[in-house]
């Protein structure tokens, strides 16, 4: 029996099915973000009603241990009382003013204190806004036009960054979506992630043309893929030598893999940092920041324009402050590391002896399981993993009350609300699936 058949037998799904019928009439594909549509795994999506701690509950009353965690923001789990209380208090005072507030000052101070590269920060409303604005700022600051990104790194849906690699080692101007014009994409170069030598060769030839290199210091949008030893350090050296800015997109890793993000974990300080997800505590938010001399080029201090009606709104700032204050507690990240290590160890043990090829990647509380026989270090090796095996595994886990992202290219997330019990139940469910596929 396939995992999908198991799920259909075990799970009540009538209400979710009826909601999907209504949704497809009024929303493209029935969803407001493509991955939610379950296209990668087949079947229809589940509609969620509520969350509590490490669990979510769908419209039919099924409960799941959640490893999506809204794709990363919910570091404390679902509906933590301190965050809910902060948002309620803020809402009673007013949801938005279109004017500065104390809350945004306090969150800016906290971010600057925690993140090594950030001396000055601008709040926005999404990770896409943050990366678009950081790229514009890099171009305005350097007077150069070209940007280098890496294949499989996702930086939101801005036209200049919605670009993937084609044939050849370095490609320029290949849009990844209809509607992105060649003109919008032609100043973006793409190279394989973790290939420092390719970067070195490109910059030896044309480095003076590049305003910035932007990357996820830990890739999370092709599954969790860590930087190889020396990769981040090499990028720092190469960009500094030619006057290009190094931009870390830490929308996913900021306050997730350590309090100071991946830059603190790996000891490499970029020029600009993009943030989001965790810093909003589950509400829409983004931010970009960096050295004072660069950030002072942003309007109204400087000529590089960026603005937003709801930027720094009290609800998001309140949720962010309540979340980030918890991250400063003794043992916070040590606990997340313990839980992540338990998940990784358990998954390796569950898969041992199976005929199924498995690679497990983890950085802190970011995790991924690939159905691949060798190391997964870039987009090519991630894309070579077995999508059909993932689909069957996904539905089996769902039928056992474990909610994974419905795509093999999404990292999983462990929250502080997870416990050893949830991790062990997850491993047991995985072991059951692997047991049916012994060598």
Swiss-Prot record:
<dbReference type="GO" id="GO:0008483">
    <property type="term" value="F:transaminase activity"/>
</dbReference>
<dbReference type="Pfam" id="PF00202">
    <property type="entry name" value="Aminotran_3"/>
</dbReference>
<keyword id="KW-0663">Pyridoxal phosphate</keyword>
<dbReference type="InterPro" id="IPR005814">
    <property type="entry name" value="Aminotrans_3"/>
</dbReference>
<comment type="similarity">
    <text>Belongs to the class-III pyridoxal-phosphate-dependent aminotransferase family. HemL subfamily.</text>
</comment>
<protein>
    <recommendedName>
        <fullName>Glutamate-1-semialdehyde 2,1-aminomutase</fullName>
        <ecNumber>5.4.3.8</ecNumber>
    </recommendedName>
</protein>
<dbReference type="GO" id="GO:0042286">
    <property type="term" value="F:glutamate-1-semialdehyde 2,1-aminomutase activity"/>
</dbReference>
<dbReference type="GO" id="GO:0005737">
    <property type="term" value="C:cytoplasm"/>
</dbReference>
<dbReference type="InterPro" id="IPR015422">
    <property type="entry name" value="PyrdxlP-dep_Trfase_small"/>
</dbReference>
<dbReference type="InterPro" id="IPR004639">
    <property type="entry name" value="4pyrrol_synth_GluAld_NH2Trfase"/>
</dbReference>
<dbReference type="InterPro" id="IPR015421">
    <property type="entry name" value="PyrdxlP-dep_Trfase_major"/>
</dbReference>
<dbReference type="GO" id="GO:0030170">
    <property type="term" value="F:pyridoxal phosphate binding"/>
</dbReference>
<comment type="pathway">
    <text>Porphyrin-containing compound metabolism; protoporphyrin-IX biosynthesis; 5-aminolevulinate from L-glutamyl-tRNA(Glu): step 2/2.</text>
</comment>
<dbReference type="GO" id="GO:0006782">
    <property type="term" value="P:protoporphyrinogen IX biosynthetic process"/>
</dbReference>
<comment type="subunit">
    <text>Homodimer.</text>
</comment>
<keyword id="KW-0963">Cytoplasm</keyword>
<feature type="modified residue" description="N6-(pyridoxal phosphate)lysine">
    <location>
        <position position="277"/>
    </location>
</feature>
<dbReference type="InterPro" id="IPR049704">
    <property type="entry name" value="Aminotrans_3_PPA_site"/>
</dbReference>
<keyword id="KW-0413">Isomerase</keyword>
<keyword id="KW-0627">Porphyrin biosynthesis</keyword>
<dbReference type="InterPro" id="IPR015424">
    <property type="entry name" value="PyrdxlP-dep_Trfase"/>
</dbReference>
